[in-house]
Curated annotation (Swiss-Prot):
Function: Kinase that can phosphorylate the tocopherol cyclase VTE1, a key enzyme of tocopherol (vitamin E) metabolism and involved in the recycling of oxidated alpha-tocopherol quinone, possibly stabilizing it at plastoglobules. Also regulates plastoglobule protein composition. Prevents photodamage of chloroplasts under continuous red light, thus working in opposition to ABC1K3. Together with ABC1K1, contributes to plastoglobule (PG) function in prenyl-lipid metabolism, stress response, and thylakoid remodeling.
Disruption phenotype: High chlorophyll fluorescence and reduced non-photochemical quenching (NPQ) caused by defects in photosynthetic electron transport. Specifically deficient in the electron carrier plastoquinone, as well as in beta-carotene and the xanthophyll lutein, and defective in membrane antioxidant tocopherol metabolism. Altered plastoglobule protein composition.
Organelle transit peptide: 1-79
Any single GO BP term: response to red light
Source organism superkingdom: Eukaryota
Class of this enzyme: transferase
Protein residues bound to ATP: 242-250, 265
Taxonomic source organism: Arabidopsis thaliana (Mouse-ear cress)
Protein name as annotated: Protein ACTIVITY OF BC1 COMPLEX KINASE 1, chloroplastic
Length: 682
């Protein structure tokens, strides 16, 4: 029976509608599966497949159906499908999975993966022993030969000079071993805690493009999943795939009922038994190597396989990606700068996904973007802001934003496709990330090291004192270059070196985040080589700190403004200037003239909360009074400078009226605070 963690209902990352979807997911999946099975049986009885398709169904060539799309006009959808941390829990979780849940810090309402589930599925299948032995021999023989060549290179002293060749050899080897190993290679490309950097660089270009499987097979799968003939649903469908990958392939089609163009993802046939078999072998090998990996590499091999297995199995259920799309639609429903394609839930199943077709311009073609009349700087600003909102505001992050998945719309919006591979961050992890930013600003590297422990990069009992100087060196070296030379790739490269010197393990969710940020930064540099990522990122973060009513962010704002108990007037001025810059860039973006974008920095709630804190929090009140009178003088000049920054952003009469209206509540809270203080003194 499918199980639900009740705590998932309280997850603050998700809206009420999103929580409802998670509650009903298991029941609806069971119902839909039964309906699909019944419809498929009926379909097999009555279908005259080839005759109907020949007479009534229009299969068009991809070149004409796509409308002569060139290399710059885009909507190619890859099929890297990784759901968020969900699945059906079957059986008792292993200790590694329990550790995975603890480290993740998010609720897991559904789970398909557990070592016990994989073992039972594999061993209960027909011919399991023969299949496992033959596959095991193939894997051991292939990897053994490769390992022997590495050993020989080391013995003859040429191991360093042949690294480029061996790295390419490893990439080709993984491709030949099939989809599980292709996905494993993509994971390794983001794990400096497991392999060295030169091999990572080679695996970064690992593509899961593979020959497509026959159309007849794909169309049969679509009909089985949807429970009716194709010609009843689509008036035409491309005769060639738009994209083909290790787990599935994509077609373009037109809905018969509405005439809308859609993209159809179809999963490869009989891929699930292959994935389960390989995961069983991976987990078996990991159990043998776990002691070695813990001692020599400082990482838990079983935990790494469990993270990988959970994500990979979720890729096999396209209903999870449909739910991801709904979540992104919910998150960006009021954002006029972002386009998320709609999903046709009634036309989706575990092996088929139907979503809105996106017509856009490939995001790595600056000339095509300019020719379309799209302001390049405006598009980059929109893209960076959208990425930061996903990471710091929603906690639901697109994990694979490569050029085939991001497009520029004619109206200046940024469009995303392919939502299978997403990273989910809990509310706690989002707050820790903001803490890390605050600690970096305050140059508190000891607390920054503790943040890495809280995020799961370091074991809880790790002594962080040796790591603090290394973090300080990295940050000061990067920050000292200024915005002109600061970029994530250089910082990540320096951080990767720490992995080899300290027991640092990169959690899977953060490897996705890091890869995503690096990919998007690379897209920005492709469009504009002198683009300064932080010149857009800093204003967004400043605006978020100043305007977000979240109590946790209010606390972080106070930490930023006070250093060693001293109020930082310059930081407040910088934050205000940066936040105003963010609003100005968005409101003046020529791509968004017809969109509703805020034109002023709304500080009303911030000022009201500040007044409330001043009255109710004795510590804050004392600090602010000291800030105004420190060094035996009134800081009138600083106050005037701050006022000049906000005078155009704040409607003083309206704010005064709101403060007056709020006075009864503030006075009540003040009396309660005062009475509690008096009673506690007694």
């Amino acid at each position: 029976m499918e199980s639900i963690h009740c705590n998932s209902l309280l997850n603050p990352n998700f809206s009420l509608n999103q929580r409802r979807r998670r509650i009903n997911h298991a029941v609806l999946n069971r119902r839909d599966a039964l309906l699909r099975s019944l419809n498929a049986v009926e379909l097999r009885r009555s279908r005259t497949f080839s005759a109907v398709r020949t007479s009534n169904f229009s299969v068009t060539a991809a070149a004409t159906d796509v409308g002569g799309r060139n290399s710059t006009d885009a909507s190619v959808m890859t099929t890297a499908m990784s759901g968020v941390e969900r699945g059906v829990r079957v059986g008792k979780s292993s200790s590694a999975l329990e550790q995975l849940d603890i480290e993740r810090g998010v609720c897991v309402p559904f789970r398909k993966y557990s070592p016990e589930t994989v073992r039972s599925k594999v061993l209960e299948s027909r011919g399991a022993v023969v299949s496992l032995v033959s596959r095991g021999v193939e894997i051991v023989w292939t990897l053994g030969l490769y390992w022997s060549t590495l050993t020989y290179d080391f013995l003859v002293g040429r191991d360093e000079e042949v690294v480029p060749f061996r790295a390419r050899q490893l990439r080709n080897l993984l491709c030949n071993l099939g989809p599980s190993f292709i996905k494993a290679g993509q994971v390794l490309a983001n794990r400096p805690d497991i392999i060295r950097e030169d091999y990572m660089n080679e695996l970064c270009i690992l593509q899961d493009d593979v020959p497509p499987f026959p159309n007849e097979v794909a169309f049969n799968i679509i009909e089985e999943e949807l429970g009716q003939p194709l010609e009843n649903i689509f008036s035409k469908i491309s005769s060639q795939t738009i994209a083909a990958a290790s787990l599935g392939q994509v077609y373009r089609a037109t809905l018969r009922a509405t005439g809308e163009d859609v993209a159809i993802k179809v999963q490869r046939p009989q891929i699930e038994p292959i994935i389960y078999r390989d995961l069983f072998l991976f987990r078996t090998l990991a159990s043998f190597l776990n002691g070695f990996s813990l001692q020599k590499l400082g990482c838990n091999a079983e935990l790494i396989v469990d993270e990988f297995g959970e994500k990979l199995l979720e890729e096999l259920d396209y209903t999870l990606e449909a739910r991801n799309i709904e979540d992104f639609l919910e998150n960006f429903k009021d954002d006029p700068t972002v386009k998320i394609p709609g999903v046709y839930k009634n036309l989706c199943g575990p092996r088929v996904l139907v979503m809105e077709w996106i017509d856009g311009i490939r995001c790595t073609d600056p000339q095509a973007i300019k020719d379309a009349g799209i302001d390049l700087n405006g598009f980059l600003t929109v893209g960076v802001s959208a990425a930061l909102r996903q990471l710091l505001e929603f906690g639901l992050f697109h994990g694979d934003p490569h050029p085939g998945n991001i497009f520029a719309m004619q109206d200046g919006r940024i469009a995303y496709v392919d939502f299978g591979n997403v990273a989910v961050l809990s509310q706690q992890n989002k707050q820790i990330l903001i803490d890390a930013v605050v600690h970096a600003v305050n140059e508190d590297y000891g607390e920054m090291a503790n943040d890495f422990t809280r995020l799961g990069f370091l074991a809880k009992d790790t002594d962080v004192s040796p790591i603090v100087p290394a973090l300080e060196a990295i940050w000061q070296n990067s920050a000292g270059k200024g915005l002109a030379d600061f970029n994530f790739r250089s910082v990540t490269g320096q951080f990767n070196k720490l992995v080899y010197d300290f027991p640092i393990r990169i959690p899977e969710r953060f490897s996705l985040v890091i890869r995503s940020l690096l990919t998007q930064e690379g897209i920005c540099f492709t469009l504009k080589p002198d683009f300064k990522f932080l010149e857009v990122a800093y204003p967004y973060v400043a605006k978020r700190l100043l305007t977000d009513p979240n109590p946790a962010l209010r606390e972080r704002l106070i930490q930023v403004l006070f250093k060693d108990g001293v109020f930082q007037w310059k930081r407040l001025e910088n934050l205000l200037s940066l936040a105003k810059e963010n609003v100005a860039k968005m409101s003046s973006n020529p791509n968004l003239r017809v969109k509703r974008v805020e034109s002023k920095l709304d500080l009303t709630d911030t000022i009201k909360d500040g007044a409330r804190l001043f009255l109710l929090d004795e510590g804050i009140r004392r600090k602010l009074i000291l800030a105004l009178t420190e060094d035996s003088k009134l800081h009138v000049e600083e106050l005037v400078d701050v006022y000049r920054l906000v005078e155009d952003e704040v409607d003083i009469p309206t704010l005064a009226m709101q403060v007056v209206q709020d006075l009864p509540n503030v006075f009540r809270d003040f009396v309660l605070s005062w009475s509690n203080s008096v009673l506690s003194d007694r």
